[in-house]
């Protein structure tokens, strides 16, 4: 009898212990997805906020892989081209959509969007929807944040140097300002311009300079123009400006290096993505919050020269987790997520540039007062169908929408980098680039 009582008591303890364990051990996520992202500040914020605000509610665990821009592009291309299926969600932009839509490399989102009215497609800027849709008019990627390009500068340093930056500057005015604001004694470069090789690194800003100088990669009938006078003049100006007044080790500086330099007070001016405000105006990251001025992308022969881009999420064609992938994408690209970032991290950090609603938000408008008009104006003015002074063979401001452009742009950027370091002249670099461009053009000439 005593043994029986002891057995019952022990059993009761075991059952209670198991029950307690079940209550205290976190439940395993119902599903897991793998997401590949570029290592920009907005994505790092997303990684930080996901577990507590998405996984907790959805039960979907998100495994992030974050890479520098050039490495990301290579990794995404390899994964979707081979159908490896290592990632469910990949980070791409308008260039990739133009080349991959309808190929099976990435999935159409139309049915998912139609079944998810809370995502509110109508709130997304038409330029973002159009840029992330294929020729079949189907949407292939959801924009996380959108951007154009603009000039950013330290107001206090400009005042100290006796410089006035116009709201709509020319590149000649920018060069003159960089000369006056360059302060090597105090470790401050007059300007930062991307020199890191890569079609989406160095040649993102540089192609906009080419455009406004009157140049183009190709004419409408596919005549290569890489060593034409306007192209050479633009690249010569860019390289000369960097060599005289630019950041140290220019060929190692991409977006990340320039944004860090600007935030840490090592750079007086910077021409780059409008989305950089999420970093340089972010309390805790930037040492100079509230000290920046903003102007439209500098011009020479065109009325505007800002680019148009979106970092966006797409579902890899080989993914077997389409539903869970969309749940994550829908949440991350929603106005609800923008509000979450605004409340948790500050409105300057919100991934803007894609939804009309955030530009009507009073708290956002208050925080973004210094750059609100320039950013919104730049996004509205950007015209991928007419970015220069002549007709083009494809749409795109800072890229040519053909698969070969990624390799072409990167190869030419490597030659330009050699010119930046004095290993060859700009003309020599672009003569080499012309030969490469002619090979691409030959595939498309009729």
Predicted ranges, named:
Residues 114, 275-288, 301-410:
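C-terminal lobe and pocket-closing loops
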Residues 135-144, 149, 172-224, 260, ...:
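Extracytoplasmic/periplasmic solute-binding protein
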Residues 61, 159, 383-446:
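Conserved C-terminal helix/tail region of periplasmic/extracytoplasmic solute-binding proteins
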Residues 31-32, 52-124, 159-166, 259-261, ...:
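Extracytoplasmic "Venus flytrap"/periplasmic binding protein-like
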Residues 30-41, 60-65, 88-89, 140, ...:
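Short, well-ordered beta-strand elements
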Residues 94-148, 202-205, 289-295, 373-388:
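Hinge/lid segment of periplasmic solute-binding proteins
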Residues 177-180, 220-252, 293-297:
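Glycine-centered hinge/linker elements that transmit conformational signals in sensory
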């Amino acid at each position: 009898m005593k043994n029986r009582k002891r057995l019952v008591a022990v059993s009761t303890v075991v059952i209670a212990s198991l029950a307690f364990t079940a209550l205290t051990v976190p439940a395993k996520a119902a599903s897991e997805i793998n997401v590949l992202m570029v290592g920009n500040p907005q994505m790092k914020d997303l990684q930080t906020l996901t577990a507590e605000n998405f996984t907790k509610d959805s039960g979907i665990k998100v495994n992030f892989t974050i890479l520098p821009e050039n490495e990301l592009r290579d990794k995404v291309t390899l994964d979707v081209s081979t159908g490896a299926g290592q990632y469910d969600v990949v980070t791409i932009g308008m260039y990739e959509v133009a080349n991959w839509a309808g190929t099976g490399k990435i999935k159409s989102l139309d049915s998912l969007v139609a079944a998810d009215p809370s995502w509110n497609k109508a709130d997304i800027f038409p330029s973002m929807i159009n840029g992330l849709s294929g020729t079949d008019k189907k949407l292939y990627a959801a924009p996380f944040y959108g951007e154009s390009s603009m000039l950013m500068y330290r107001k206090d340093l400009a005042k100290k140097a006796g410089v006035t930056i116009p709201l709509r500057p020319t590149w000649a005015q920018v060069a003159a300002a960089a000369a006056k604001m360059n302060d090597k004694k105090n470790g401050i470069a007059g300007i930062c311009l991307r020199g890191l090789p890569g079609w989406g690194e160095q040649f993102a800003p540089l192609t906009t300079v080419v455009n406004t100088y009157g140049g183009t990669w190709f004419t409408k009938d596919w005549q290569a123009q890489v060593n034409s006078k306007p192209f050479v003049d633009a690249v010569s100006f860019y390289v000369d400006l960097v060599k005289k007044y630019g950041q140290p080790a220019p060929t190692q500086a991409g977006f990340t290096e320039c944004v860090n330099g600007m935030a840490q007070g090592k750079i007086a001016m910077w021409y780059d993505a409008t989305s950089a405000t999420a970093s340089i105006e972010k309390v805790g990251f930037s040492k100079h919050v509230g000290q920046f001025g903003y102007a439209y992308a500098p011009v020479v022969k065109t009325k505007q020269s800002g680019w148009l881009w979106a970092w966006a999420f797409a579902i890899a064609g080989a993914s077997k987790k389409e539903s869970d992938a969309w749940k994550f994408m829908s949440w991350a690209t929603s106005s609800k997520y923008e509000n979450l970032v605004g409340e948790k991290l500050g409105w300057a950090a919100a991934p803007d540039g894609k939804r009309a609603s955030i530009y009507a938000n009073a708290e956002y408008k208050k925080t973004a007062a210094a750059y609100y008009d320039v950013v919104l104006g730049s996004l509205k003015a950007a015209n991928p169908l007419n970015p220069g002074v002549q007709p083009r063979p494809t749409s795109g401001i800072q890229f040519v929408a053909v698969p070969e452009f990624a390799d072409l742009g990167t190869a030419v950027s490597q030659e330009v980098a050699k010119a930046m370091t004095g290993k060859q002249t700009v003309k020599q670099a672009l003569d080499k680039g012309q030969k490469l461009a002619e090979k691409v053009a030959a595939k498309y000439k009729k």
